């Protein structure tokens, strides 16, 4: 613990927190273009084929983003909107693609949690 004299001489350094989504540059979302759409396998206890895309952002970064929901219409050169949020069992995937905006279609026949997947209200 420093003495009062030491604190007068040099003030305490403020701790800088590292951002978990540096490619967004402090913005809530970023636009980008898909350079590659593929599937990836998750870490050890889980087993699946997770849908991911490599995206070049307007901020100049190229990142890997997760495509949530069942089925998607993305291919190379699709324009997508990216938000933060990692996928715990996919190393290096720190972003999510926003469903139902730009070239990304919403999930078909989705009835619950529709706003998260860009699905319209079901007609009855």
Curated annotation (Swiss-Prot):
<comment type="similarity">
    <text>Belongs to the universal ribosomal protein uS12 family.</text>
</comment>
<dbReference type="GO" id="GO:0006412">
    <property type="term" value="P:translation"/>
</dbReference>
<feature type="region of interest" description="Disordered">
    <location>
        <begin position="103"/>
        <end position="124"/>
    </location>
</feature>
<keyword id="KW-0694">RNA-binding</keyword>
<keyword id="KW-0820">tRNA-binding</keyword>
<dbReference type="InterPro" id="IPR006032">
    <property type="entry name" value="Ribosomal_uS12"/>
</dbReference>
<feature type="modified residue" description="3-methylthioaspartic acid">
    <location>
        <position position="89"/>
    </location>
</feature>
<dbReference type="InterPro" id="IPR012340">
    <property type="entry name" value="NA-bd_OB-fold"/>
</dbReference>
<dbReference type="GO" id="GO:0015935">
    <property type="term" value="C:small ribosomal subunit"/>
</dbReference>
<keyword id="KW-0689">Ribosomal protein</keyword>
<dbReference type="Pfam" id="PF00164">
    <property type="entry name" value="Ribosom_S12_S23"/>
</dbReference>
<dbReference type="GO" id="GO:0003735">
    <property type="term" value="F:structural constituent of ribosome"/>
</dbReference>
<dbReference type="GO" id="GO:0000049">
    <property type="term" value="F:tRNA binding"/>
</dbReference>
<keyword id="KW-0699">rRNA-binding</keyword>
<dbReference type="InterPro" id="IPR005679">
    <property type="entry name" value="Ribosomal_uS12_bac"/>
</dbReference>
<comment type="function">
    <text>Interacts with and stabilizes bases of the 16S rRNA that are involved in tRNA selection in the A site and with the mRNA backbone. Located at the interface of the 30S and 50S subunits, it traverses the body of the 30S subunit contacting proteins on the other side and probably holding the rRNA structure together. The combined cluster of proteins S8, S12 and S17 appears to hold together the shoulder and platform of the 30S subunit.</text>
</comment>
<keyword id="KW-0687">Ribonucleoprotein</keyword>
<protein>
    <recommendedName>
        <fullName>Small ribosomal subunit protein uS12</fullName>
    </recommendedName>
</protein>
<keyword id="KW-0488">Methylation</keyword>
<dbReference type="GO" id="GO:0019843">
    <property type="term" value="F:rRNA binding"/>
</dbReference>
<comment type="function">
    <text>With S4 and S5 plays an important role in translational accuracy.</text>
</comment>
<comment type="subunit">
    <text>Part of the 30S ribosomal subunit. Contacts proteins S8 and S17. May interact with IF1 in the 30S initiation complex.</text>
</comment>
């Amino acid at each position: 613990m420093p003495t009062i004299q030491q604190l007068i001489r040099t003030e305490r350094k403020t701790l800088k927190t590292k951002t978990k989504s540096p490619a967004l540059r402090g913005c809530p979302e970023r636009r980008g273009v898909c350079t590659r759409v593929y599937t990836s396998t998750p870490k050890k206890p889980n087993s699946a084929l997770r849908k991911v895309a490599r995206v070049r952002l307007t901020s100049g970064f190229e990142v890997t983003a997760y495509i949530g929901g069942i089925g998607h219409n993305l291919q190379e050169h699709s324009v997508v909107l990216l938000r933060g949020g990692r996928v715990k069992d996919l190393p290096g995937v720190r972003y999510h693609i926003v469903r139902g905006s730009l070239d990304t279609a919403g999930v078909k026949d989705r009835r619950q949690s529709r706003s998260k997947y860009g699905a319209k209200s079901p007609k009855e």
